[in-house]
């Protein structure tokens, strides 16, 4: 029996989401559209199989074929990032990060990560996250002068704090991160260097952002976002002793049975990332972000760090228009443009209001948008934000969005 026949209520909810994805311009930087092959693997009968443990070391019988699946994912991931040891089992990026903490630290140990307001992530030491609850978390930020990481300041804080682990990586930082400098800082204070490359993994895979692997003790990522795979996490290292600790921290430390259907989908995405066309795609992602950035600047908006090196931009809507990020998000959604409000460095607004918005290009680049389309998108966004209480203007923009979306993949 089909889902439609058995559960029409759920089927209709999925169909409505399908329509939303087809009719909205998707600019959330952490989202993307997976291939049909990834979807096929994710919806496969592998969801039926329990496989606690690792290939050739399972706690259940009948795992010979899921072993093949996981080994494929491991081998492809190693090839992409030139890593000696990988773990493809984490259910999410946050669980991958939690496994790193468990593997390398004890509760109460000091960590130094990027402040959430400056572009960091909840798992980098935020007080309401496990990372700030079980560990003594300290933070570095960005310079007030250029809104970029001030590595001298990071060093100064590290010397003062003496963390056991330093975390590099971000969820809202539009510039290249210098992992070599972070390695030097970590070595100065005798700390582990942990890099969370979730947002930039696809760029790193193609050599469009420096790789953290030569410098970090351990690296994590999500498999969605720029990697364009299923929702999930991965962990990579070149250190054999750390790899053993990581494996124990993932299973049985953080998780029980792995999601074999998701691991299969990861394997598909990793094969796609090894295809030469993937670099063409990632190159276009960056070109599109620069087109978006340049257009917003020409329209008089302040951009955090004055631009971008990667797949995202942070736009200050408060300084130009006097509106909050939430105002912007709500108005744009009425026009079928999906974005997220985002705190900016040194933001005076509350986290649920914010002074800015975060825009990313990966999803619509997958749909075939290039520079001209993103220039148009920036203009449409400006039209809405300059008229957030004008329903006539918003409806006009919505019609233009629907017209644009009719021509995409």
Curated annotation (Swiss-Prot):
It is found in: Cytoplasm. Its EC number is 2.1.2.1. It comes from the Bacteria. Pathway: One-carbon metabolism; tetrahydrofolate interconversion; Amino-acid biosynthesis; glycine biosynthesis; glycine from L-serine: step 1/1. The modification N6-(pyridoxal phosphate)lysine is found at residue 225. One of its GO terms (biological process) is tetrahydrofolate interconversion. It catalyses: (6R)-5,10-methylene-5,6,7,8-tetrahydrofolate + glycine + H2O = (6S)-5,6,7,8-tetrahydrofolate + L-serine. Its main location: cytoplasm. PROSITE patterns: SHMT. It is an enzyme of class 2 (transferase). GO terms for molecular function: glycine hydroxymethyltransferase activity; pyridoxal phosphate binding. One of its GO terms (cellular component) is cytosol. Its cofactor is pyridoxal 5'-phosphate. Keywords: Amino-acid biosynthesis, Cytoplasm, One-carbon metabolism, Pyridoxal phosphate, Transferase. NCBIfam families: PRK00011.1. PANTHER family: SERINE HYDROXYMETHYLTRANSFERASE (PTHR11680), SERINE HYDROXYMETHYLTRANSFERASE 1 (PTHR11680:SF35). Belongs to the SHMT family. Homodimer. Catalyzes the reversible interconversion of serine and glycine with tetrahydrofolate (THF) serving as the one-carbon carrier. This reaction serves as the major source of one-carbon groups required for the biosynthesis of purines, thymidylate, methionine, and other important biomolecules. Also exhibits THF-independent aldolase activity toward beta-hydroxyamino acids, producing glycine and aldehydes, via a retro-aldol mechanism. This is Serine hydroxymethyltransferase. It comes from Acholeplasma laidlawii (strain PG-8A). The lineage of its organism: Bacteria, Bacillati, Mycoplasmatota, Mollicutes, Acholeplasmatales. The gene is glyA.
